[in-house]
Amino acid sequence: MPRLTPRLPALLLALALPGVLRAQDKPPEVKFIVPAGAAATLPFSPAVRVGYMLYLAGQIGTDSTGRLVPGGIEAETRQTLTNIKRVLDANGSGMDRVVRCLVMLADIAEWGTMNGVYVTFFPGPKPARSAFGASGLALSARVEIECTATVR
Protein backbone atom coordinates (compact mmCIF):
# COMPACT_ATOMS: atom_id res chain seq x y z
CA MET A 1 0.00 0.00 0.00
CA PRO A 2 1.54 3.36 -0.99
CA ARG A 3 2.24 5.85 1.75
CA LEU A 4 0.37 9.18 1.17
CA THR A 5 1.22 11.02 4.37
CA PRO A 6 4.14 13.14 3.00
CA ARG A 7 2.02 14.21 0.03
CA LEU A 8 -1.04 15.17 2.07
CA PRO A 9 0.11 18.70 3.08
CA ALA A 10 1.06 19.49 -0.52
CA LEU A 11 -2.30 18.20 -1.75
CA LEU A 12 -4.21 20.27 0.82
CA LEU A 13 -2.21 23.38 -0.08
CA ALA A 14 -2.84 22.85 -3.79
CA LEU A 15 -6.58 22.57 -3.14
CA ALA A 16 -6.76 25.61 -0.84
CA LEU A 17 -4.43 28.01 -2.66
CA PRO A 18 -6.77 29.02 -5.52
CA GLY A 19 -9.46 30.09 -3.04
CA VAL A 20 -6.98 32.10 -0.99
CA LEU A 21 -5.65 33.84 -4.09
CA ARG A 22 -9.16 34.69 -5.29
CA ALA A 23 -10.05 36.19 -1.90
CA GLN A 24 -6.94 38.39 -1.98
CA ASP A 25 -7.60 39.48 -5.57
CA LYS A 26 -11.06 40.80 -4.70
CA PRO A 27 -11.07 44.59 -5.16
CA PRO A 28 -11.84 46.66 -2.06
CA GLU A 29 -15.37 47.88 -1.55
CA VAL A 30 -16.05 51.44 -2.76
CA LYS A 31 -18.59 53.48 -0.79
CA PHE A 32 -19.69 56.96 -1.87
CA ILE A 33 -20.59 58.92 1.25
CA VAL A 34 -23.26 61.59 1.16
CA PRO A 35 -24.39 62.44 4.71
CA ALA A 36 -28.06 63.04 5.46
CA GLY A 37 -28.88 66.69 4.88
CA ALA A 38 -26.03 67.20 2.40
CA ALA A 39 -26.98 69.11 -0.69
CA ALA A 40 -28.24 66.55 -3.22
CA THR A 41 -27.41 69.01 -5.99
CA LEU A 42 -23.64 68.84 -5.42
CA PRO A 43 -21.82 67.35 -8.42
CA PHE A 44 -19.53 65.30 -6.14
CA SER A 45 -19.49 63.09 -3.05
CA PRO A 46 -18.18 64.74 0.14
CA ALA A 47 -16.17 61.57 0.83
CA VAL A 48 -15.42 58.21 -0.76
CA ARG A 49 -14.27 55.17 1.18
CA VAL A 50 -12.20 52.54 -0.63
CA GLY A 51 -11.31 49.66 1.66
CA TYR A 52 -9.56 51.22 4.65
CA MET A 53 -8.89 54.56 2.93
CA LEU A 54 -11.12 57.63 3.13
CA TYR A 55 -10.81 60.32 0.46
CA LEU A 56 -12.39 63.66 1.34
CA ALA A 57 -13.49 66.20 -1.22
CA GLY A 58 -12.06 69.68 -0.76
CA GLN A 59 -13.60 71.47 2.21
CA ILE A 60 -14.01 75.21 2.67
CA GLY A 61 -14.93 77.25 5.72
CA THR A 62 -18.71 77.09 5.51
CA ASP A 63 -20.95 76.89 8.55
CA SER A 64 -24.01 74.64 8.94
CA THR A 65 -26.07 77.00 6.75
CA GLY A 66 -23.60 76.71 3.87
CA ARG A 67 -22.31 80.26 4.25
CA LEU A 68 -18.64 81.11 4.40
CA VAL A 69 -17.69 82.14 7.94
CA PRO A 70 -16.62 85.77 8.37
CA GLY A 71 -13.18 86.67 9.69
CA GLY A 72 -10.80 85.96 6.83
CA ILE A 73 -8.16 83.29 6.49
CA GLU A 74 -7.84 82.43 10.19
CA ALA A 75 -11.57 81.89 10.76
CA GLU A 76 -11.99 80.09 7.44
CA THR A 77 -9.08 77.74 8.12
CA ARG A 78 -10.46 76.88 11.56
CA GLN A 79 -13.93 76.20 10.13
CA THR A 80 -12.49 74.22 7.20
CA LEU A 81 -10.54 71.94 9.52
CA THR A 82 -13.55 71.61 11.85
CA ASN A 83 -15.59 70.49 8.82
CA ILE A 84 -12.88 67.98 7.90
CA LYS A 85 -12.81 66.65 11.47
CA ARG A 86 -16.60 66.21 11.39
CA VAL A 87 -16.47 64.16 8.16
CA LEU A 88 -13.59 62.04 9.47
CA ASP A 89 -15.28 61.35 12.82
CA ALA A 90 -18.56 60.41 11.11
CA ASN A 91 -16.75 57.83 9.00
CA GLY A 92 -14.64 55.93 11.53
CA SER A 93 -11.52 58.03 11.17
CA GLY A 94 -10.04 61.08 12.88
CA MET A 95 -7.46 63.83 12.57
CA ASP A 96 -4.80 61.41 13.84
CA ARG A 97 -5.54 59.13 10.85
CA VAL A 98 -4.98 61.79 8.15
CA VAL A 99 -2.07 60.78 5.93
CA ARG A 100 -2.14 63.56 3.33
CA CYS A 101 -3.58 67.06 2.84
CA LEU A 102 -3.70 69.37 -0.14
CA VAL A 103 -4.11 73.05 0.76
CA MET A 104 -5.24 75.64 -1.79
CA LEU A 105 -4.95 79.30 -0.83
CA ALA A 106 -6.55 82.24 -2.60
CA ASP A 107 -3.45 84.23 -1.59
CA ILE A 108 -0.24 82.31 -0.92
CA ALA A 109 0.88 85.24 1.26
CA GLU A 110 -1.66 83.95 3.83
CA TRP A 111 0.23 80.65 4.15
CA GLY A 112 1.71 81.58 7.54
CA THR A 113 -1.64 82.51 9.08
CA MET A 114 -3.30 79.37 7.69
CA ASN A 115 -0.41 77.25 8.95
CA GLY A 116 -0.74 78.69 12.47
CA VAL A 117 -4.29 77.35 12.68
CA TYR A 118 -3.55 74.15 10.74
CA VAL A 119 -0.92 72.87 13.19
CA THR A 120 -3.37 73.14 16.12
CA PHE A 121 -5.49 70.41 14.46
CA PHE A 122 -2.48 68.10 14.10
CA PRO A 123 -0.65 68.19 17.47
CA GLY A 124 1.09 64.84 16.86
CA PRO A 125 2.79 63.64 13.70
CA LYS A 126 1.80 65.80 10.73
CA PRO A 127 0.36 64.34 7.52
CA ALA A 128 2.17 64.79 4.22
CA ARG A 129 1.03 68.06 2.67
CA SER A 130 1.23 70.26 -0.39
CA ALA A 131 0.08 73.89 -0.48
CA PHE A 132 -0.24 76.30 -3.36
CA GLY A 133 -1.94 79.52 -4.41
CA ALA A 134 -5.13 79.14 -6.44
CA SER A 135 -7.57 81.67 -7.79
CA GLY A 136 -11.30 81.20 -7.99
CA LEU A 137 -12.00 78.95 -4.99
CA ALA A 138 -15.70 78.16 -4.44
CA LEU A 139 -17.73 80.93 -2.77
CA SER A 140 -14.62 83.16 -2.95
CA ALA A 141 -13.11 81.18 -0.07
CA ARG A 142 -9.62 82.05 1.17
CA VAL A 143 -8.68 78.38 1.71
CA GLU A 144 -9.75 74.91 0.59
CA ILE A 145 -8.31 71.71 2.06
CA GLU A 146 -8.60 68.17 0.74
CA CYS A 147 -7.49 65.17 2.84
CA THR A 148 -6.89 61.44 2.65
CA ALA A 149 -7.12 59.32 5.79
CA THR A 150 -7.18 55.73 6.96
CA VAL A 151 -10.22 54.29 8.71
CA ARG A 152 -10.00 52.63 12.13
PLM region descriptions:
Residues 1-9:
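Bacterial N-terminal signal peptides that target proteins for export
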Residues 8, 12-82, 86-100, 104-152:
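N-terminal presequence-like segments and the immediate start of the first folded domain
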